[in-house]
């Protein structure tokens, strides 16, 4: 019933500002609100979607060979402070150096008795099912 009253209004019930719709049946008034105003951006000629504030600068590139071999560059996420110093290899866990950082292994290269084999097989089956079901019609 409220919807009938709302749409039965003068047709201009969705204006840009909040106002009240009169209820013809009684003294109850419906409050209608709309979206907030668009933010005004400074700078640029008609720059749509331009961000207000500082312009971002590219990080400085380090060319010092001593610094590059003793510190990982770009790891420090804070504005102030020094970069982390690399430790000797003996202080890191052994599994870190056994990780596969190259291309992923193929299904034929894995042993069928391992969990990685079955996970990759399941992933391949899901990909195959998705390819086949893409062409099906309703």
Curated annotation (Swiss-Prot):
Compartment annotation: Mitochondrion
Chief place of localization: mitochondrion
Superkingdom of source: Eukaryota
Molecular function GO labels: structural constituent of ribosome
One Pfam family cited in the UniProt record for this chain: Ribosomal_L37
Keywords: Mitochondrion, Ribonucleoprotein, Ribosomal protein, Transit peptide
GO cellular component: mitochondrial inner membrane; mitochondrial large ribosomal subunit
Transit peptide region: 1-16
Summary of subunit composition and partner proteins: Component of the mitochondrial ribosome large subunit (39S) which comprises a 16S rRNA and about 50 distinct proteins.
Entry's family note: Belongs to the mitochondrion-specific ribosomal protein mL54 family.
Protein name in the entry: Large ribosomal subunit protein mL54
